[in-house]
Amino acid sequence: MRKTLNYVIMAGFQSPITIAQAIERIHRNEYLLPAFQRDFVWSAEQIEKLFDSLMKGYPISSMLFWKVKGGTKTDFRFYKFLSAFIQYHRICNDPIPTDNINDFYAVLDGQQRLTSLYIGLCGSYAYKDYRKRWDYSEYNFPTRHLYFNISRKYTQEESDREFIFSFVDKNISKENDLFIDKSNEKWFRVGKILALHQDYNYGIDEFAEDNNIDKESKRLLRLLDNVIHTKLNINFYEEDEQKPDKAVNIFIRINSGGTALSFSDILMSIAIANCKQMDAKTEIKNLVEHVRSKGFNISHDFILKSFLYLYHKDVRSLITSFNLGFIELVENNWTRIRDAVSNLFDLLRSFGLTDFTMTSYNAAMPILYYLYHLSLIHISEPTRPLYIS
């Protein structure tokens, strides 16, 4: 049995690829992010350290991709990679219609690293300048691009890093491929390495000659080129079963460190991401707090289960249940659902029930179903016996 299990696990590992190949696949929307992925949270310093580690030859831990094909592509919402990050103001990814695109990979593990590489090579990172205001403007949150100091390295006394990468304000760099700072040190825009590699008529040698780059600096450029275009730095495991629940369970397992994710958290993320008209996160949060104010300590898990109980033939919490069509149905009937849930707990409280005496909130689901589908929304004390007659 153990040999068989090992074979199944190993069968999913694919041939490693270069960083440049991964970037190209992101460009072509072959790598996308599922709705349950978290927002990008890495700092500029973390991205700089990632590039330093790559230059030192340190490996990137393996990633996990889910091959999405067929009907699964349109059952859920997927997102593009973030390229222009703005601290606090632009941290969310843009959704992408997937009905007319080829099969693609959804990144289950590796989002932060791949996004960091993408921003470093093709995008920008803006964060608030010291003592500036928090409202967004280019002045307060200047756009920065990743640059590589090719004039020197860090000393051991300066930093635990060796290679100097830094996000430089575009007002300083003028967005040039190479700029010289006040200390007469040369900074190379990291994303330029992609163009130099692809242009057969104008590569590193020609660039170095035009910019008076010395031998040691050119060696650093070649090392960067090798890291991006030659070394097979991206190792990944492919999951190709069209079972969203399995993909989510894998995602939960690999993200179990730190703040634990539950299956309910994932369903909540999918519900929020797939709502088109209402702010589902705020609406559900407000409803939960409203019910808690009545003395019943429910969570968003109860609200999600109520969606299934009211509308779905299968009341199990499955990813496949929370597809776009189902979420649209919930969204269109949200006001009635909200009122039914609120009045359910008014009714339970009028019966003398409390959070302490409710052994399971699942027991209240049939009552919710009855109230909702018979449109018995507004409950008052004089009419209470009508519900139990």
Question: Which residue stretches match the model-derived regions?
Answer:
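Short alpha-helix boundary/capping motifs
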Residues: 1, 278-279, 334
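N-terminal amphipathic/basic-hydrophobic helices that include classical n-h-c signal peptides
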Residues: 1-9, 386
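Extended hydrophobic/Leu-rich segments
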Residues: 1-4, 82, 164, 368, ...
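Basic- and aromatic-enriched surface patches that contact anionic nucleotides/nucleic acids
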Residues: 6-44, 48-312, 355-356
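Short amphipathic alpha-helical segments with coiled-coil-like heptad repeat character
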Residues: 258-260, 375, 387
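Single conserved hydrophobic/aromatic residue that forms the stacking wall/gate
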Residues: 377-389
